[in-house]
């Protein structure tokens, strides 16, 4: 009996180790290229509107793929989908590295990488729920969460070092390391019974077309892209109202508090993601820092602070003071952006402090948004609603990166708005930081109103 229990426990621990490796490299793949965006822009002589698609392409297929893999896990089985995701991710890495001299191939490779990497967060949680004993699941989820946070933290530092001392193209090879998990996971995971079900491919295609063309509009400002996007979304909404098992539950659209919470959360998450994508350009133009310095000195401390702030935010929410946590988070965000807009020209170390408070504020805000949104859902809506929140959060990050790239490439925000004598190189970035602060405050006011009018006990 004890031997059987020990073997089972060992198997569970082995599964958890390989899941942690997949989770780490999934996040790392998302983070490492961010600090190299200015270098990529210089290599291809492209504006930020085009260059930011290196990250936007990944986030686009990553967010959509996360939802798709979750839908398919019962129909095709976890083992098969994990293997598919790992192979696709590695295939994208090879294409990107071999074809890194061609911008179109690089973007295509990032689309492919995102489609593969999306399998990891979508399926890792399902594996934990199915294979790890109930009494150990909390520890397992906590460990994976810590590994993900560590990946987000060290990603910019690793990316900056490799890009500065070797070349940014080698960052594309990092996900290939995940191939080592294949034989172990295939051996450890059981053969599953496939459940027949309907998969709404038409709905996914319509939604994806709408999203892609909207992002193209945000970087090119072509009205034709916007028209295609709007038409695709209208057809998508009509489609999900007719089918029996839609990709997105149309009933959630009638839950106004939920939709407002998701929208405001998405705007805040997208704003911060856009800011983080802007930091490498800003530090190069204003302070002439190297890629290694931007990754390890400027961004790294902020990404690591997320672990601490996220833990504190969770404690505040558990003690039933989410409004207090929300106010702290929004204060950190808005004041940090506002302060940075006025003091951008000061020492580069100042931006390190700003990023610590920005990402710390985001940790507080994420925790509270999740609480508020979940509290606006009925019990039968919880699964679909929280999945939609997760999908929207990921998608908004890619959208924020695309929008900021577009704003960095047009002269709209070039004139000086602040009444200060500063170097002309700071005008654009100061204006954007001022805009970020305003967006955060408006989103906060709407969320605050939603919170106060909620009839549920948080």
UniProtKB/Swiss-Prot annotation:
Keywords of this entry: Antibiotic resistance, Antiport, Cell membrane, Hydrogen ion transport, Ion transport, Membrane, Plasmid, Transmembrane, Transmembrane helix, Transport
Extent of the signal sequence: none
Major site of localization recorded for this protein: membrane
Gene Ontology molecular functions: antiporter activity
Top-level division of the source organism's lineage: Bacteria
InterPro entries: MFS, MFS_dom, MFS_trans_sf
Keyword Ribonucleoprotein attached: no
GO biological process: proton transmembrane transport; response to antibiotic
Cell compartments where the protein resides: Cell membrane
Membrane topology according to the record: Multi-pass membrane protein
Gene Ontology terms: cellular component: plasma membrane
Transmembrane segments: 12-33, 81-100, 111-129, 140-162, 165-185, 201-221, 223-240, 256-276, 297-317, 324-344, 346-365, 432-451
Assigned protein family: Belongs to the major facilitator superfamily. TCR/Tet family.
Protein's UniProt name: Tetracycline resistance protein
């Amino acid at each position: 009996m004890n031997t059987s229990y020990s073997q089972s426990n060992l198997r569970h621990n082995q599964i958890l180790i390989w899941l942690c490796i997949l989770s780490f490299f999934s996040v790392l793949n998302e983070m490492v290229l961010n600090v190299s965006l200015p270098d990529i822009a210089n290599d291809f002589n492209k504006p930020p509107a085009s260059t930011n698609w290196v990250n936007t392409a990944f986030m686009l297929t990553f967010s959509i793929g996360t939802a798709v893999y979750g839908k398919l896990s019962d129909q095709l089985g976890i083992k098969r989908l994990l293997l598919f995701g790992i192979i696709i991710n590695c295939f994208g890495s090879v294409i990107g590295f071999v074809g890194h001299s061609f911008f179109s191939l690089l973007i295509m490779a990032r689309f492919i990488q995102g489609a593969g990497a999306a399998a990891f967060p979508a399926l890792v949680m399902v594996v934990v729920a199915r294979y790890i004993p109930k009494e150990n699941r909390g520890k397992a989820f906590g460990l994976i969460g810590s590994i993900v946070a560590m990946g987000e933290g060290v990603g910019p530092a690793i990316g900056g070092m490799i890009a500065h001392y070797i070349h940014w193209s080698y960052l594309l090879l990092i996900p290939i390391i995940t191939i080592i998990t294949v034989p172990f996971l295939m051996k450890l995971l059981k053969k599953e019974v496939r459940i027949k079900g309907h998969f709404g491919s038409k709905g996914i295609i319509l939604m994806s077309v709408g999203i892609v063309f909207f992002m193209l509009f945000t970087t090119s400002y072509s009205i034709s892209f916007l028209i295609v996007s709007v038409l695709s979304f209208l057809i998508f909404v009509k489609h999900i109202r007719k089918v029996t098992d839609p990709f997105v539950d149309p009933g959630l659209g009638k839950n106004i508090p939920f939709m407002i919470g998701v929208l405001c959360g998405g705007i805040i998450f997208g704003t911060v993601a856009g800011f983080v994508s802007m930091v490498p350009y800003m530090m190069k133009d204003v302070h002439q820092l190297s890629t290694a310095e931007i990754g390890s000195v400027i961004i790294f401390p902020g990404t690591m602070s997320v672990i601490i702030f996220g833990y504190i935010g969770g404690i505040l929410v558990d003690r039933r003071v989410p409004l207090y946590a929300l106010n702290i988070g929004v204060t950190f965000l808005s004041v940090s952006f506002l302060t940075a807009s006025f003091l951008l020209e000061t020492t580069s170390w100042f931006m390190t402090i700003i990023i610590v408070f920005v990402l710390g504020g985001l940790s507080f805000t994420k925790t509270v948004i999740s609480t508020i949104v979940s509290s606006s859902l009925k019990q039968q809506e919880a699964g679909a609603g929280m999945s939609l929140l997760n999908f929207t959060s990921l998608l908004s990050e890619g959208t924020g990166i695309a929008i900021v790239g577009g704003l960095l490439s047009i002269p709209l925000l070039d004139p000086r708005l602040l009444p200060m004598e500063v170097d002309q190189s700071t005008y654009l970035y100061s204006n954007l930081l001022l805009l970020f602060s305003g967006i955060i405050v408006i989103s906060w006011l709407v969320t605050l109103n939603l919170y106060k009018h909620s009839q549920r006990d948080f």
